A protein has these predicted regions:
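Short C-terminal domain-edge/linker segments immediately following a structured domain
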Residues: 120-126, 195-200
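Aromatic/basic-lined ligand-recognition segments
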Residues: 164
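A structural motif
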Residues: 122-141
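Hydrophobic alpha-helical segments of membrane proteins, primarily the transmembrane helices
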Residues: 80, 84, 119-124
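Extended intrinsically disordered or low-complexity regions, especially N/C-terminal cytosolic tails and loops
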Residues: 1-114, 142-155, 161, 177-258
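Substrate-binding/catalytic groove segments of enzymes
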Residues: 167, 172-177
Length: 258
């Protein structure tokens, strides 16, 4: 009688890094597309349409608190900025957490595709210790435990400070967010166009850094394109991180095979 039990049934398997990375980047694109949709919708909205929608139910929860079109434009913009930066921070942390679990599995298994219960438990223990730590400590542990130097680490840290100022200080930069030079610096990834194919209408470019500097007491203001570039920067950060993780896995496997 043949054994129809699938091999390694119930046995934990190595995480598919490529699949994790693809799913993460697909999520990034959805966030980017949604932001573009919201920005386009905001450009098209008219005061008459807003007032018509306000009056459609013929009743309000608290009429004296009603805000006019200009007030709601400012409020909606502030809400959008906080949402975009908050979502970006969540995405960055999620990417780091996913990367760390893969790294922990690789280390525990010496990059074997088969994961023993003991190795899986060891990786889970490491992950439980990693999840609750502060952002700067996550970067430290990735470097100390796995030799992973994260590109754009400073940008992610700065976004954390920006979110702190938006949520706790009314969007005004204060001393806790400043560096040794008295500045809050955010480096964003943007594209420098190098050449264009006239016939195909295609542009060739490369990613470069674009600095945005805030001083103490300044309000955190971002253009529409800068909000989009924040998402591009998070995507660039994640892409670099996943590539570094892949190189780590290869180095561990090569060492194990030698």
């Amino acid at each position: 009688m043949s054994d129809n039990t699938p091999p390694n049934q119930g046995q934990p398997q190595q995480v598919n890094l490529q699949q994790v990375a693809q799913q993460f980047m697909a999520g990034m694109q959805r966030h980017f597309d949604m932001l573009a949709f919201n920005l386009a919708a905001r450009e098209c909205v008219q005061e008459e349409a807003y007032n018509a929608r306000i009056n459609a139910p013929k009743v309000m929860p608290a009429g004296p608190r009603h805000q006019n079109f200009e007030q709601m434009q400012a409020y909606a913009r502030d809400l959008l900025v906080r949402q975009v930066i908050g979502d970006c921070m969540n995405l960055a942390v999620t990417g780091m957490n996913n990367a760390h679990f893969f790294l922990a599995l690789v280390k525990a298994t010496k990059a074997s595709p088969q994961v023993s219960p003991e190795a899986h438990a060891e990786a889970q223990k490491s992950q439980r210790a990693f999840l609750p730590v502060q952002l700067d400590e996550k970067f430290n542990r990735l470097e100390q435990d796995y030799g992973i130097m994260c590109e754009l680490e400073d940008s992610i840290i700065s976004l954390g400070f920006i979110l702190q100022a938006l949520m706790q200080q009314g969007g005004i930069v204060k001393e806790p967010q400043l560096d040794a030079k008295g500045e809050l610096v955010l480096e964003l990834k943007t594209v420098e166009i190098l050449s264009r194919e006239v016939d195909a209408g295609k542009a060739h470019g490369k990613l470069i850094d674009q600095r945005k500097v805030f001083k103490e007491g300044e309000a955190l203001v971002f253009s529409d394109v800068e909000l989009q570039l924040i998402l591009v920067t998070i995507a660039s950060f994640a892409d670099s991180l996943f590539k570094s993780v892949s190189l780590y896995a290869k180095s561990v496997k090569d060492a194990s095979d030698s």
